[in-house]
């Protein structure tokens, strides 16, 4: 028996910081009628260099908090959490916490479309250290498209640059160029580049500037949204458990005013933010 309410509720979106706001934005563009709760564990961000166990523990706490807030379905809008915690939560925790609830990630929806996008069959992944070390993209892509070669490069400075509101500085330009040059040097045949961290679309103008025109750049928001739409279509029982009033609540583990200010980098609208502690 579940310890949580079985009443219909909002869709939860979790990220270690602000990057998941790009996922939430993509989802709301396609599915505006649903209710959402966004939870950012900003006080403990970034997750990229943390161990598998720590990321799992933090992500589990966040998922439980969203369940307690009424969410029947939670999207891990964080690549590191999707890479390091999703499987354990799906296989070990959900059967005990509530077998009817669902937790989905952002890596699988991206992997599903890659084989349709690349012509050279050479794909690059720019992501956090944790996501690259997990080999999650390589495993998921090659499970679906075994003829695709995947090259991954960690970009450890990109998230701090974005969260410090320095995306438009010469320093950002320098570090973006350095990583792109490196990945294209490793595999010059890459024709599709995945932004494997939900923060990275903020750097899109700089990334596009340094990537050859024939290389397409894949940001995740659109594909995660389409995947969620398809999931709800295929699971009408879950779709009926998601409320629809077009509302959004924002929760953060840090100072709400700081979150409100920094969220403007990612979404151009005024947000009301509540503080929450994860235990």
Residue ranges and their predicted role:
Residues 1-279:
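Non-catalytic structural scaffold of enzyme domains
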